[in-house]
Amino acid sequence: LKIIEDIETTPELLTTLTAYLLDHESSMANTAKALCCHINTIKYRLNSIRDNTGYSPSKPADVYPLLIAVAINRMKNSENE
C-alpha cells in the first residue's frame, strides 16, 4: 500500500503504527506497554511515521487513511500465513 510503503522497510515503525491504531485505540501509553518500550519511544516513532509518510497518526484528518492502510496490511499478511 502506497501510504505506508515508506515505513514498511522499518518494521518497528509499522508495528508501532499498527499497534497504536488497531490494537490500543491511539493510546501511546498502552502501545508503549504492549511493545515493552518507553512512551517517548512511541512518540519518536509516531513522529518518524509522520515524517516518512506525510500523515500524522495523532492528527484526526490523517488517521483514517493510515488506519485503512494498516488494517489492509494486517489482513494481507494474515492471508499469507
Language-model features, listed with the residues they occupy:
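Cytosolic nucleotide-utilizing catalytic cores of signal-transduction proteins
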Residues: L1-E81
